[in-house]
């Protein structure tokens, strides 16, 4: 039986999940954090057990070695030969990649070239790819792109209203992100509703530390909130989301700590959003604790967060000319009932109504009332499974 690893590598972390395929059975999962530091943390979960170790992991190559050694050490696999495929989540595929691809040297180079579109993600992903190809050179490696699902957007949707030379010369356009998640939950929503996906109009809300909203028409992405980079859209955990671009040169002129545009963009990516406004945390659980304590900064951050999400959902009702369902997914989308309640209550004009008894922590499924004209669903995303499936599919093309 073949085993496939789904990888989500960042600049200082490597998250993984091992599947037995084609049964789609999760055998183990884990994460290696703080790569590049002497107190890196490796966590492995398998058979109801959890192993955690602190050690020195200087780079992604050593992280991959540690991961593979752990799989052997804990008896999860007997030999590396059992692993027949590795799938890598890539945030930005630009216009190079409209679907998942088998990795070769050119693919790795293109992923690195696209780092400007996802500076927090693509460099780490490329490092992860190179590490696996070095250590397991004979297995099939596949790249699965967050942007691929959004390549169905029409030109009038993905182009920005700036001179077209910036698109033709520099490929400045909306690319979107979280596409693997949006695709998966839309397919699951169709099953839940008992209707063909190609008959549905859905708004999918991926609300985690990163937040993106997508308008899905008959199974295809027709608009999405993330843009040229994952910085665009609603307010997020540490990202600002959409702001007036004229703020950037203004801040450079006013704040001596912000020396150039890169400094401002770094601030917008890493020091803004819920964490930046509240001064407390980027974690919604901490923000909700602040609400309970009547912390004014927590209240302000929460209100901005809800307001921005509602506005994007409202936009996509207009884009789709109505919707059959609103789908919440990802960390906050699945586990923050107060957030879901306040978003939906602010959109009641569209005919949505939440059942408070179903809108509780841990519930999955239809949380709307019987009278709700638009269904409200909570669906757990499974990007890793989507990656593993694409590896299995593309392995057949390599062997044929």
Swiss-Prot record:
The active site is at residue 146. PANTHER family: ACETATE KINASE, ACETATE KINASE-RELATED. The record marks 178, 239 as: Transition state stabilizer. Belongs to the acetokinase family. It is an enzyme of class 2 (transferase). It is found in: Cytoplasm. It comes from the Bacteria. PROSITE patterns: ACETATE_KINASE_1, ACETATE_KINASE_2. ATP binds at residues 15, 206-210, 283-285, 331-335. This is Acetate kinase. Its EC number is 2.7.2.1. One of its GO terms (molecular function) is acetate kinase activity. It comes from Streptococcus equi subsp. zooepidemicus (strain MGCS10565). GO terms for biological process: acetate metabolic process; acetyl-CoA biosynthetic process. Keywords: ATP-binding, Cytoplasm, Kinase, Magnesium, Metal-binding, Nucleotide-binding, Transferase. Pfam families: Acetate_kinase. Substrate binds at residue 89. HAMAP family: Acetate_kinase. Pathway: Metabolic intermediate biosynthesis; acetyl-CoA biosynthesis; acetyl-CoA from acetate: step 1/2. It catalyses: acetate + ATP = acetyl phosphate + ADP.
């Amino acid at each position: 039986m073949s085993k496939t690893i789904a990888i989500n590598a960042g600049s200082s972390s490597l998250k993984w999940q091992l599947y037995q395929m084609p049964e789609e059975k999760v055998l183990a999962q884990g994460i290696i954090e703080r790569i590049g530091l002497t107190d890196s943390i490796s966590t492995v979960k398998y058979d109801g057990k959890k192993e955690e170790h602190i050690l020195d992991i200087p780079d992604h190559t050593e992280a991959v070695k540690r991961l593979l050694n752990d799989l052997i050490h804990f008896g999860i696999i007997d030999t590396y030969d059992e692993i027949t495929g590795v799938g890598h989540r890539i945030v930005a595929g630009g216009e190079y990649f409209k679907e998942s691809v088998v990795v070769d040297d050119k693919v790795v180079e293109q992923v690195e070239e696209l780092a400007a579109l996802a500076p927090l993600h693509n460099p780490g992903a490329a490092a992860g790819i190179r590490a696996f190809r070095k250590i397991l050179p004979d297995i099939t490696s596949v790249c699965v792109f967050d942007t691929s699902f959004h390549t169905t957007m029409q030109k009038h949707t993905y182009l920005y209203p700036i001179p077209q030379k910036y698109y033709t010369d520099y490929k400045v356009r909306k690319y979107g992100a979280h596409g693997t998640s949006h695709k998966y939950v839309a397919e699951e929503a169709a099953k839940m509703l008992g209707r063909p996906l190609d008959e549905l109009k859905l708004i999918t809300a991926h609300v985690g530390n990163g937040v993106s909203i997508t308008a899905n028409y008959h199974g295809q992405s027709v608009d999405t909130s993330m843009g040229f980079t994952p910085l665009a859209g609603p307010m997020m955990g540490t990202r600002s989301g959409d702001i007036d671009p004229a703020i950037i040169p203004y801040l450079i002129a006013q704040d001596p700590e912000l020396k150039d545009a890169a400094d401002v963009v770094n601030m917008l990516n890493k020091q803004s959003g819920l964490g930046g406004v509240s001064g407390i945390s980027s974690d919604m659980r901490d923000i909700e604790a602040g609400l309970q304590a009547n912390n004014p900064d927590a209240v302000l951050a929460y209100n901005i967060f809800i307001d921005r999400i509602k506005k994007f959902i409202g936009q996509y009702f207009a884009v789709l000319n109505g919707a059959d369902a609103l789908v919440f997914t990802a960390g906050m989308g699945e586990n923050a009932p107060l957030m879901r309640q306040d978003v939906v209550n602010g959109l009641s004009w569209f005919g949505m109504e939440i059942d408070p008894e179903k809108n509780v922590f841990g519930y999955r499924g239809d949380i709307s009332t019987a009278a709700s004209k638009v269904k409200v669903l909570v669906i757990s995303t499974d990007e890793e499974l989507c990656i593993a499936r694409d590896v299995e599919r593309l392995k057949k093309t390599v062997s044929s």
